[in-house]
C-alpha cells in the first residue's frame, strides 16, 4: 500500500517517479527463506506490478497532453475576450454625443424593470454593421441576474455607455424592419431579424416592436451561430453570411434548428443549388452534420488570428489521413500572413480548417468538414460535381495549390497507410474505380495540371514485424531462465535494431492475428481449434481425433506438449496466432509492392510444426501458412515461391507441407549428423514427391563443426545455381540463427558468424526482384542472434556496404572434408533435376576468394569473345 500511494502521489506532481521495485523485492526475497513456489508467485506479481506502473505512466502522459490542450483553449478564450473588449471601447468612442442625450431622454420615459440581457454582446456586434462591414457574433455571456432597474442592471458592457448602445440598437432594429417591409431582405436576413426582434423584446421588458410581422421564440443561447473572424469580411468585402454553423450541443432548440435546416434543403439537389455572392461561407446544410474527425476541433481557427501577423514556420495543419503540411511550407510562395489572409483564403475556398482528401471523397466531393459514416454509404451516384467545380473556379490560386499539393502527397504515400486510415473507405472506392467517372476525371485534371502524374517509382522501404504480445508467451512456472525459448529472444533483437537505427529507417507492420481459416491451410481443423482457441473448446470432440492425448508435466512445474515445448493456455494461443499473422501481413505487403522486403521478429517459431503435431517450440508453421496465403491471394505475383531454411535444425514441418507442390522450392542448410541431431529428418535423399521431385534440396552437414567457409561453399555450389534455375517470384527465409557461434552443442554447436547471415541475405536480394521476407525461427544465444538479425536487416535496407562483409579468414579458407563430402553427395543426387549443378564439383574444394577470381576471369574472356565477334 505504501508503494502504491507513493506512486500515485508522484503522478500528481511534476512527473511519475518509478520506485526501484526490483532491488527492493530481490532484497526481500534474499533475506527470507521462501519456497520456490512463493518466489515464483512474487516474481509474477512483481511483473504485473511493473506493467501496471507502465500503464500508469502512460495514462499520466496522456493526461498531461489533454491538460496542455485545455490550457490552449483557455488562452484562446482569454485572448478572444480581450479583443472583444477592445472592439467595444473603440465602438463607444465613435458614438455621436447627440445620440447619448437622446438615449437619456428615452430611458427616463422607460425606467421600469427590464428582463435580463443574456445576449447583449452578440446582439450589439450583430447589429453594428452600419458601414457595410459584418461584425462577428460573439459567444453569449453565461451571467444571468435577477430583474432590476436599467440603471442598476449588470452586463458585460460598462454602465457609462449602456444608454448609447440601447438607442443605437433601437435605430438598427427600425432600419432592419423597414428594409424587411420593402422586400429587400432575403430569407436568411428574415430569419436573423426574427431572432433579433425576440431579443429586443426581452431587453425592453416585453414591449413589442412596431411593424413586426413574425417572431422567433429564442429561449436558449444555443441558437446563436459560431463567431466568424472579422478579417474574412474585410478581405473579401462580403455583406452578410447566408448561413452559420450551429453550436454542436445536444440541446432541444439546436435539434429543432437542425430539423428546420433539413426541411429547408429538402427538394433542392446540389446541382440546382445556386451560391449567393454576398455570403462568406457557402455552407450547405450537410455541413451542419457532426464531424467524425477527432482532430477537427482540437485547435481553434481564431487562435492563429490572435497571434501577430507573421508567418509561423512551425505551424502545422493536421489532417486525419494526409501527412501534416507546414503552413510556411504550403504557402511559402504566397507569403500569407497567418493573422488574416489564411483565414480569408480558407473561407472563400469553402474549406474547413483541416483539409483531407478522403474527407472530400466521403463528403461527395464537396469541400468542407467530415461527415458521418452514414453519408459514406450514399457516396456513389447521390452527389454532383458542381460543388467541386464551383469552388475550384473561384479564382483562388492558393486553394488550387494546396489541393494539388495534398493530392501529390497522397499519390506518393504507401497504400498501407491509406488502408489504416479511418476515412480510407472513400479512397479505396476511388482506387477500385467505383467513383463516378466525372469525379475521377476532375481529380485527374487537377493532378495533370500540376504535372506530377508522370511515371514515378514508389519509394518502398523495408518492413519490420514485431509485437510485444508475443513476449508474453511463457511457461506456467514463470521461470524463463529454465527455458531457452523465451520472450527475451525477440526483445533483444528488437533492442539491437533500435540501437542501430534500423527501426527508424524501416516501416513497422501492424501485427495481426492469423485467422482460423488461414491456419487451416496447413493444419487440421481440430488442431487449429486446440492451439488457436483453447483445448477446452475441443471437449466435445472424440479423444482419438485430438492432436494431443495429454500434456506432460515438465521438471520446472509447468506443462508442455513435449519435454521442450511448454504450453500456457493464457498466452500461447495469442502469441502463436500473432506470429503467423504478422508474417502473413508482412509478406502480403511485399507481394503487393508496398514494401520492398521485410524481417518478421516473431515467436514462437514454426518450421517444426506439422499438420497435426506441435514440436520443437513450434505450434503453427508460420512460413508454411504465409506461403499458402500468398499462393491463394496472389497467384500471379507469387506463382513460384522459394523457401530457404538456414536454421541449424531441419524444418521437417515445412518440408512436409510442400513436398508435393511443384511451385514451391524448399532448400535447407542444417546439421544432420546422419540423423542423430534433432529432428533427425532432412537427409540428402529426401528430394520431394511426384511432380515436385527435385524441389526439396537438403544440405545435411555431418561430422566436423561448420563455420563460414563451409556455408560459403554450400551457398556458391548448391544454393545459388538452383535459385538461378528456379527463378522464384517470391522468397521466404526461415531465418534461424542457432547456427551462429555461442550456442552449446545440444542447441547448435556450429560457429557461423553474424556477418555470414548478412552475406546470405544480400545474395538473396539478387533474385525475385528483391522480394525477400525473413521470418525468425530458432536461435537462443541473445548476443549472437541479435547481431545476426542486425546484419540481415542492414542488408535488407541496403544503405550500407558493411552488411555481410566477411573476414579474410572466411574468404581464404578451404571448407573442411566433412562439408566437401556432403556437398558432393548433394550435387550427385540433384544434378539430374538441376542441370546447372553440372561442373560445380570443381568449385567445392576451393576458397571463396579463388572462386571469385575464377569467375572474374571467365567473365573477362566472355567479354573479349563478344568484342571480337
Curated annotation (Swiss-Prot):
Keyword Repeat: no
Swiss-Prot/TrEMBL keywords: Chromatin regulator, Hydrolase, Nucleus, Phosphoprotein, Repressor, Transcription, Transcription regulation
Subcellular location as annotated: Nucleus
CDD domains linked to this entry: HDAC_classIIa
Bias (Polar residues): 184-202
GO term, biological process aspect, one: regulation of neuron differentiation
Alphabetical list of InterPro entries matching this protein: HDAC_PDAC, His_deacetylse, His_deacetylse_dom, His_deacetylse_dom_sf, Ureohydrolase_dom_sf
Catalysed reactions, as listed in the record: N(6)-acetyl-L-lysyl-[histone] + H2O = L-lysyl-[histone] + acetate
Assigned GO CC terms: cytoplasm; histone deacetylase complex; nucleus
Modified residues (Phosphoserine): 251
Molecular function GO labels: calmodulin binding; histone deacetylase activity; histone deacetylase activity, hydrolytic mechanism; RNA polymerase II-specific DNA-binding transcription factor binding; transcription corepressor activity
Post-translational modification remark: Phosphorylated by serine/threonine-protein kinase kin-29 at Ser-251; the phosphorylation inhibits repression of transcription by mef-2. May be phosphorylated by either cyclic-AMP dependent or cyclic-GMP dependent protein kinases.
Active-site residues annotated for this sequence: 608
Keyword Transcription regulation belongs to the record: yes
Catalytic activity, EC: 3.5.1.98
UniProt tissue specificity: Expressed in body-wall muscle cells, hypodermal seam cells and neuronal cells including sensory amphid neuronal processes, the nerve ring, ventral nerve cords and motor neuronal commissures.
Main location: nucleus
Positions of region (Disordered): 1-25, 128-167, 180-218
Region (Histone deacetylase): 460-802
The family this protein is said to belong to: Belongs to the histone deacetylase family. HD type 2 subfamily.
Functional note: Responsible for the deacetylation of lysine residues on the N-terminal part of the core histones (H2A, H2B, H3 and H4). Histone deacetylation gives a tag for epigenetic repression and plays an important role in transcriptional regulation, cell cycle progression and developmental events. Histone deacetylases act via the formation of large multiprotein complexes. Involved in transduction of sensory signals, together with egl-4, kin-29 and mef-2; binding to transcription factor mef-2 enables negative modulation of chemoreceptor gene expression in chemosensory neurons.
PANTHER family: HISTONE DEACETYLASE (PTHR10625:SF5), HISTONE DEACETYLASE HDAC1-RELATED (PTHR10625)
Protein name per the record: Histone deacetylase 4
Species assigned in the record: Caenorhabditis elegans
Gene: hda-4
